[in-house]
């Protein structure tokens, strides 16, 4: 099936939300979630998933648009219900989602432009989702420099600079210095933010930088010899700040402190908690030593069942049992209802054979070496004891 290239109305007006189009084709497609319908129109306002950005959302003739993709300049709309071929339909773009994406993308351009101009680094990986924007730069940027760039981006936003879109000729593009994430064939669309960035881009952008509202760096991490920087702009940045402010307010109430002392209070709590964990582990270790001492010295096997015990303590106990007893040495942690985690060791028996028996008779999981195995089993204490007694 050959479909004509889709007229991209969003290139003409990024702020338009309603349009009419003719249905050129409609196909039923089976997906994991059920049947969906791929629809092709002669023209559309729906921006597809392209250039690292999530697609537009909305409806066509009241039917929810589930996805929008582009290939060879043909845009495919995936809908929850079919549309009749040859009919005229009305599309409505979710403006809130579109504008939020525009804020993110325009903010990213300013940030990436500043990085490129100052350090010569390229944005080699870009992803704009509904929750975060990530940029991968092929060079290291210090925390101090990132903070300066963030401030400069917000200064550019305050300046309310016009965002310009142009379509240079082949001759003009040859001498134009611009950023580009990929090799582009055919007509190149250039988005310019004077003084900050010139970049090839297919996505809708705000008219002026002031509409971005603000930009906030949310996270920074080393990535493939460079740096991955996560940002949010505009209303999404505001929503994230509200969430963080709400968390801080609740924590201040819990600790009966102010914001300045909050980190210190949390650190103290963390240290106290770790101290108590260490003390509890020591107490459990000491208790287990008493239980081990209570096992008759002439026993061949030494098997203990505990309701709650940390893995390091279990391993220490099993290692100690192996030194004292010649048979199966094991600690099972849990209960008959939810099952048991176990570590089994022996210096005279092949633990792999014990694991095989547990798998065969009790459907246990796990494995290890001939000296020690580790795993889990959904069986009762009585069933486990009866099986181990036969080995």
Which sequence ranges carry the predicted segments?
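A glycine- and charged-residue-rich anion-binding loop/surface
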Residues: 1-391
């Amino acid at each position: 099936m050959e479909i004509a290239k889709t007229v991209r109305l969003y290139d003409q007006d990024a702020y338009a939300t309603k349009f009419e189009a003719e249905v050129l084709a409609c196909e039923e497609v089976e997906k994991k979630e059920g049947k969906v319908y791929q629809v092709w129109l002669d023209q559309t306002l729906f921006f597809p998933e392209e250039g690292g950005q999530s697609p537009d959302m909305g409806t066509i003739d009241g039917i929810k648009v589930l996805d929008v993709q582009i290939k060879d300049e043909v845009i495919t709309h995936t809908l929850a219900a079919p549309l009749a071929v040859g009919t005229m339909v009305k599309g409505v773009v979710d403006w809130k989602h579109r504008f939020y994406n525009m804020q993110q993308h325009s903010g990213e351009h300013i940030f990436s432009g500043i990085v490129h101009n100052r350090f010569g680094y390229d944005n080699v990986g870009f992803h704009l989702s509904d929750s975060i924007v990530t940029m991968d730069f092929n060079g290291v940027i210090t925390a101090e420099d990132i903070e300066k760039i963030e401030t400069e981006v917000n200064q550019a936003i305050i300046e309310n600079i016009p965002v310009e879109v142009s379509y240079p000729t082949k001759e003009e593009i040859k001498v134009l210095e611009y950023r580009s994430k990929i090799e582009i064939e055919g007509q190149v669309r250039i988005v310019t933010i004077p003084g900050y960035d010139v970049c090839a881009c297919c996505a809708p952008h705000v008219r002026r930088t002031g509409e971005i509202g603000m930009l906030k760096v949310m996270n920074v991490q080393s990535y493939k010899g460079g740096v991955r920087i996560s940002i949010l702009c505009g209303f999404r940045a505001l929503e994230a700040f509200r969430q963080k402010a709400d968390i801080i307010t609740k924590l201040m109430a819990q600790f009966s402190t102010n914001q300045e002392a909050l980190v210190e209070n949390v650190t103290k709590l963390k240290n106290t908690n770790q101290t108590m964990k260490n003390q509890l582990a020591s107490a459990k270790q000491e208790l287990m030593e008493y239980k081990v001492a209570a096992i008759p010295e002439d026993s061949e096997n030494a098997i203990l069942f505990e309701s709650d015990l940390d893995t390091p303590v279990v391993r220490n106990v099993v290692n100690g049992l192996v030194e004292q007893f010649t048979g199966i040495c094991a600690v099972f942690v849990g209960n008959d209802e939810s099952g048991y985690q176990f570590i089994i060791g022996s210096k005279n028996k092949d633990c792999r054979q014990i694991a095989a028996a547990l798998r065969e008779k009790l459907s246990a999981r796990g494995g290890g070496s001939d000296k020690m195995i580790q795993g889990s089993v959904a069986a009762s204490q009585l069933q486990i004891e009866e099986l181990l007694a036969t080995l």
